[in-house]
A protein has these predicted regions:
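Positively charged, low-complexity intrinsically disordered leader regions
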Residues: 29-54
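Short, low-complexity, charge-dense intrinsically disordered segments
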Residues: 1-25
Length: 220
C-alpha cells in the first residue's frame, strides 16, 4: 500500500522484491489469482543497473540494539555486506560495548539510558552519522523505553534522507503515524498486524483486513 510519500510492504513479500530471483509467488482471493514461478529476474533493469563493484555502491547506516539484544543489527549488517553495499556502519547503544562490542568490531556507539537502550542524548550522534549515509535502516531490537521512543520520533523527522523502518521500530511509530505517512523516502517492512495497526493509527481511509487478500490490501 502507499500513503502519500511512504511505501509499505508486508514482511514476507519484500524478500521476493529484494532477491528478484527464483520467484515463487501466489496471491489469491475470491476473484483474483496470480502465479509466477521462474528462474529469471523479476526486475532485470534493477540487476543491470547495479554497480559492478562496491566503490560505486551506496553507504548504509544501521541503527538498533539494546543491552539484551543486537541480533537485528548484526543480521542486517551481514545481509548488507552480502548484498554488496558500498560501505556499512552499525550504531549500538554504548551500554552494550563491553558485552557485544567484540562481536561487531566495526560498530560505533551512541549514548544510552541506564537500562541500556538509546537515550535522547544519542540523537546528535545518530544524525551526524546519518549525514554520512545514503540510507538509514532502523533495524529494531530497541527494547521498551519511553526515552528511546522520544529519540526515535525526533530522529525520523530530523533526518530527511532515505529511511527504512522494520521489526519493533514499527511499533514505536504508532504514536506519530499521522506524520509518518506523509514523510517522503520512507519504507516500512513489518508484519501484517503491524501494518494494520499503523494504518489505523494514521487514520487511513480504508482499513486493512487479513481476509481481504494481498491484492485488495495493497490497493487500499
Amino acid at each position: 500500500a502507499e500513503f502519500a510519500g511512504i511505501s509499505i510492504f508486508l514482511f514476507p513479500i519484500v524478500f521476493y522484491v529484494i532477491r528478484c530471483v527464483n520467484l515463487t509467488q501466489q496471491i489469491c482471493n475470491n476473484d483474483y489469482m496470480w502465479l509466477k514461478q521462474t528462474d529469471k529476474p523479476l526486475y532485470p533493469e534493477i540487476l543491470w543497473s547495479r554497480p559492478e563493484n562496491r566503490n560505486g555502491a551506496g553507504r548504509l547506516l544501521i541503527i538498533g540494539g539494546n543491552t539484551h539484544a543486537i541480533a537485528a543489527s548484526a543480521t542486517a549488517f551481514a545481509a548488507a555486506e552480502v548484498a554488496g553495499a558500498g560501505a556499512v556502519r552499525v550504531i549500538l547503544p554504548d551500554h552494550v560495548r563491553k558485552t557485544f562490542g567484540k562481536f561487531l568490531p566495526e560498530a560505533f556507539f551512541a549514548p544510552s539510558t541506564p537500562s541500556g537502550s538509546f537515550g535522547t542524548s544519542a540523537l546528535a550522534e545518530l544524525l551526524s552519522q546519518a549525514d554520512w549515509a545514503d540510507a538509514v535502516l532502523l533495524a529494531g531490537d530497541f527494547g521498551r523505553n519511553s526515552e528511546t521512543a522520544s529519540m526515535i520520533e525526533k530522529f525520523v523527522f530530523k533526518y530527511d534522507g532515505l529511511l527504512c523502518i522494520t521489526q519493533d521500530t514499527v511499533e514505536y511509530c504508532y504514536n506519530f503515524a499521522v506524520k509518518l505517512v506523509v514523510r517522503p523516502n520512507t519504507l516500512i517492512v513489518g508484519s501484517f498486524a503491524q501494518i494494520q495497526r499503523l494504518a489505523t493509527s494514521s487514520k487511513a481511509p480504508k482499513s486493512l483486513q487479513f481476509n481481504d487478500g494481498l491484492v485488495r490490501n495493497v490497493g487500499a
